[in-house]
């Protein structure tokens, strides 16, 4: 897959912009706080239907404007495609998606049309932070590649919220207790779908990340990933989740919240058998995240059947020369969008399009 054009209208600090990227590397350079990251954010919006920086879509609309639009055109094996995301402050529907000439009924229909992997300095939190950050990493990867997973995840969140609301209602009205069985069954059923997808994906990412990390470290360190779940090893995830919910019912009723399930999942990340979050140095943690992102890129290509785009947001300056060289070797294989303040960070990379960014204005150099 190759992005042939990206157009922005009233998006963040861009009045209007048209980008015709190189088939290889396209670089956006300039001082900080000029709008470089906003371009990658626009691409990410067309990949996943949401920003990687904020959950508030209205923040993406240019100040003083009622709406914003991002359009991406791509060339793929089966022809050319176009997707557009329109955000509005004033319309009843705040976000709409167009796929070609058709308006999508659901945001999830966007998934899979533009496949991309974003790597930013904030991704270090995948290793450093708690389980929620690693679940987010899993869910964003799988939602993009498997729309059915995205819809299952939406159902799981709704069902969990409804079960938690019922637990609070039961505290006030114990006669509602029998209705809990229905929600347990629904939560276990959709949870099993999530669990099985996560288990399989983490297994594949483990192999790919391990190989990438061995290459990055010259064979000196072994990175491993392991899916951590209350039912990770169960042959039947549905039955195991249902049993866990049954055993936890008294505690759930006492605390008025669901204490077991997929919302407690995690990925254990280890280097040479030691937990990377606790025992790895900052440099080792950066290497681990880079290996994860390279694995994510490989998995996305294998699952989608198309080479995904790679978005690098000011990460070159964060890497030492060895890691930078390893990453540059790999970006030659896919279409890559890079933001940086200094072009020397990309020494050795294949030359492509370069845009100078100043206060939301792009100049191709």
Which functions belong to the PLM regions below?
Residues 125-126, 132-181, 185-188:
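Long, charged N-terminal accessory/stalk domains
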Residues 72, 335-342:
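Structural recognition of the conserved hydrophobic beta-strand(s) that form the central parallel beta-sheet
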Residues 36:
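Conserved lysine of the Walker
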């Amino acid at each position: 897959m190759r992005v042939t054009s990206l157009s922005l209208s009233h998006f963040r600090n861009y009045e209007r912009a048209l980008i015709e990227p190189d088939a290889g590397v396209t670089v956006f350079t300039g001082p900080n706080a000029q709008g470089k990251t906003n371009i990658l954010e626009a691409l990410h919006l067309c990949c996943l239907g949401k920003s990687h920086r904020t959950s508030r879509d209205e923040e993406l609309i240019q100040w003083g404007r009622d709406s914003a639009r991002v359009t991406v055109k791509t060339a793929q094996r089966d022809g050319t495609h176009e997707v557009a995301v329109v955000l509005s402050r004033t319309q009843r529907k705040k976000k709409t998606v167009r796929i070609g000439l058709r308006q999508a009924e659901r945001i999830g229909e966007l998934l899979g049309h533009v496949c991309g992997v974003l790597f930013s300095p904030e991704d270090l939190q995948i290793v450093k932070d708690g389980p929620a950050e690693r679940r987010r990493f899993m869910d964003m990867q799988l939602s993009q590649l498997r729309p059915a997973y995205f819809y299952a995840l939406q159902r799981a969140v709704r069902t969990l919220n409804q079960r938690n609301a019922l637990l609070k209602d039961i505290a006030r009205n114990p006669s509602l207790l029998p209705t809990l069985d229905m929600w347990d069954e629904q939560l276990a059923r959709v949870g099993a779908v999530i669990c099985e997808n996560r288990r399989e994906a983490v297994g594949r990412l483990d192999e790919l990340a391990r190989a990438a990390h061995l290459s990055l470290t010259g064979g000196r360190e072994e990175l491993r990933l392991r899916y951590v779940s209350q039912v990770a090893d169960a042959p039947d995830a549905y039955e195991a989740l249902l049993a866990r919910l049954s055993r936890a019912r008294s505690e759930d009723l006492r605390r008025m919240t669901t204490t077991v399930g997929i919302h407690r999942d995690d990925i254990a990340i280890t280097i040479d058998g030691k937990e990377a979050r606790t025992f790895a140095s900052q440099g080792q943690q950066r290497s681990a995240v880079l290996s994860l992102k390279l694995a994510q890129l490989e998995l996305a290509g294998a699952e989608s059947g198309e080479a995904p785009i790679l978005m690098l947001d000011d990460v070159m300056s964060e890497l030492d020369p060895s890691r930078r060289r390893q990453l540059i070797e790999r970006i030659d294989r896919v279409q890559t969008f890079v933001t940086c303040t200094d072009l020397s960070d990309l020494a050795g990379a294949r030359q492509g399009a370069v845009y100078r960014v100043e206060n939301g204005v792009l100049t191709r150099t």
